[in-house]
Amino acid sequence: MDASNPIVHPIGDHHAVDLEEGPLIVTMKELPGMPGTIGGLALRVGQFLFAAAAIVIMVTGDEFTNYTAFCYLVAAMSLQFLWSFMLAILDTYALLIKRGLRNSVLLSLFVVGDWVTATLSLAAACSTAGVTVLFDNDLNYCGQMHCHRYQLSAAMAFLSWLLIGMSSLLTFWLWASE
């Protein structure tokens, strides 16, 4: 549904006289977190900052190239960084020219791109966390490796995935309501 009844969700100071003329319909065009809003920009900035942190933390480890899960995390977070940075620039541009990003073709591109990057990010974060738990709890390699660094990188990847998941759901909601 694309509208809200002011009796249920009052906006401003409406008198009973206004309601006798017929129901007032208030459109919900800009919900927080939608593309082209301040909330959407904040989500995108958080996504690319956490992705960048995951990359930097992982790459500064000595032996990350020896393990496929760690290399996959760097690749997935690089894609996440590029996607979120590009959309943050687009959100900034939309805010500067005061135009919304409600084109259905554009929204469908955002939804599919968010789903792909969210899936890759979650897979990378889970595989990195799994390998790190294996090294720490089962193989006792953490005395020889930088396990805490890898755990922190996985945590940053999970935070980036959480933000892109929120952004993906909000964009899908907007796209489905068009």
Curated annotation (Swiss-Prot):
Residues 59-69, 126-154 are extracellular. It holds the Pfam family CASP_dom. InterPro entries: CASP_dom, CASPL-5. The chain crosses the membrane at residues 38-58, 70-90, 105-125, 155-175. It is found in: Cell membrane. It is a multi-pass membrane protein. Its main location: membrane. Belongs to the Casparian strip membrane proteins (CASP) family. Homodimer and heterodimers. PANTHER family: CASP-LIKE PROTEIN 5A1, CASP-LIKE PROTEIN 5B3. This is CASP-like protein 5B1. It comes from Ginkgo biloba (Ginkgo).
